[in-house]
C-alpha cells in the first residue's frame, strides 16, 4: 500500500499546476487516479522529447517506453507502470493509444518540426492529443462512438490552442508548428522559426489555425451537450479552461511582441464553480 500511495502522490504532483488539473480533481477517486496516470505518462514522454539530450538518446528512451507498454499489456509491467495495470483493466485502455502518444513524441525527436503540411500537423495532433483523449473518454465513461468523436475534436482543439499559445517557446526549441498552407496564405515563404515569428504577416498565418481550433471546440461542445452532465463534467472544465486561453490569445493578437497569456485564478475558480456541480 505504501508503494501505491507513493505512486498516486507522484502522479498527482505531476498534474498539479496543469490546465487539466481542475477537471481531473472533479472525478471520483478511481477515475481520478487513472487520469492522473495517463497525464503522468504523457508528461514523462513529453519531457523526453523536449530534453536537450542527443536525438539518439531520446529515441532510445522513447523505445524503452514502447517496450514497457508492451510489457504492461502482457501483464508483466515494469515498476513505473505497475500501478497502471488496474486502470488498463478497469477502463479498457488500449495499447495502441499509449503507443500513438509515443509515436507523436518521436515526431518531435526525429527532426525539428517546421512548417509541416496540414495533414502532418493533424496526424501529430491525433497522436499527442487525441490519443490521450481516446484513453480519457474511456475513463470518463462515454459511449464508444461519442467518446471517439469527442477525443478527435477536443484533443485537436486543445493542441491547436497550445500551438498558438507557445509559438515563441517552440521557436526557441527550433520548432514551428504553423502549417505550410497557413504560412502560404499569409505570404510567408520562410520555414525558419525565428524569421516566421518576427514576420508582420504572422497574425494572418495564425488566423486559420485559430478558426480550426474554434471549430473543434464547437464540435466537442455539441457532443458533450448530448451526454449526461456527470459524465462530461471533467472534459467540460478542461475545454472551458482552454477556450479561455484561446479567447485571450485572440484578444491579444499574434503580432510581435507577444506577451504571454494566462487564465487568472479567478476565472479558473469561476469555471470550476459553474461546471463542477453539473449533475
Swiss-Prot record:
CDD domains noted in UniProt: Trans_IPPS_HH
Pathway as given in its UniProt record: Secondary metabolite biosynthesis; hopanoid biosynthesis
One record GO biological process: carotenoid biosynthetic process
Pfam family, one: SQS_PSY
Family listed: Belongs to the phytoene/squalene synthase family. HpnD subfamily.
PANTHER family: BIFUNCTIONAL LYCOPENE CYCLASE/PHYTOENE SYNTHASE
Protein name: Presqualene diphosphate synthase
Protein's organism: Sinorhizobium fredii (strain NBRC 101917 / NGR234)
